[in-house]
Amino acid sequence: MTAQLEGIGMTSRRTRMRLVQRLREGGIESDRVLEVIGQVPRHIFLDEALSHRAYEDTSLPIGHGQTLSQPYIVARMTELLLAHAPQRVLELGTGSGYQTAVLSQLFPEIYSVERIRPLQDRARDRLRQLNVRNVLLKHADGGMGWPERGPFDGIIVTAAPVEVPRELLDQLADGGVLIAPVGEENQVLVEIIRKGNHFERHNLEPVHFVPLLGGVIR
């Protein structure tokens, strides 16, 4: 990372390391995930007015009714995905691009879909700042996935559907894993593993995400 991206004060590497320590104490076990969380400058994915809060373990607004997910949940979902070592990962909900940047450091190919064009444009700029080259972005309804690029052996969903759309399950490769928050008021983080035509579901822990909405915003 450049000196500009390292930041100073509240955005410094030391501040990031304190966040990493909190995540480790909170139950994140993967050293690889924690290393990447410590490297990726979360502050550049926020408006300047909020950048001083970048390394708090909390979700923060990014506009258009969307949020930058809590670092714990970014680390948790990434850790769950990493346990299955997928090579081709589909992310639904690029948002600010922070989760995308984290994924890009751990998996060879990332395909990320965002329905809100201004968010996607800003995410693209930030990923370019970080010289990320293994991510393809698409402006589309995330609930439909990216069928022409599938199947994927990893799918991560960063907004909550009431139920996982069948279209996404169909894009999951045999042996692949899907990590998503599911539900309305009472959401749960789920892990779904495809075994042939059977989908094995594990409910993991309660979460709170913005809902997965259909359509696109230009």
UniProtKB/Swiss-Prot annotation:
Pfam families, alphabetized: PCMT (PF01135)
Q: Recorded GO terms, molecular function? A: protein-L-isoaspartate (D-aspartate) O-methyltransferase activity
For this chain, the family text in UniProt reads: Belongs to the methyltransferase superfamily. L-isoaspartyl/D-aspartyl protein methyltransferase family.
Places the protein is found: Cytoplasm
Sorted alphabetically, the keyword list is: Cytoplasm, Methyltransferase, S-adenosyl-L-methionine, Transferase
| Matching HAMAP family | PIMT
Q: Where is the active site?
A: 69
**Role description:** Catalyzes the methyl esterification of L-isoaspartyl residues in peptides and proteins that result from spontaneous decomposition of normal L-aspartyl and L-asparaginyl residues. It plays a role in the repair and/or degradation of damaged proteins.
List cystine links: none
Carries keyword Acyltransferase? no
Q: Name one GO cellular component term.
A: cytoplasm
What Enzyme Commission number(s) apply to this enzyme?
2.1.1.77
Q: What does it catalyze? A: [protein]-L-isoaspartate + S-adenosyl-L-methionine = [protein]-L-isoaspartate alpha-methyl ester + S-adenosyl-L-homocysteine
Q: Which top-rank group of organisms is this from? A: Bacteria
Please name the CDD domains in this protein's record: AdoMet_MTases
Q: What is this protein called?
A: Protein-L-isoaspartate O-methyltransferase 1
Its BP terms in the Gene Ontology are: methylation; protein modification process; protein repair
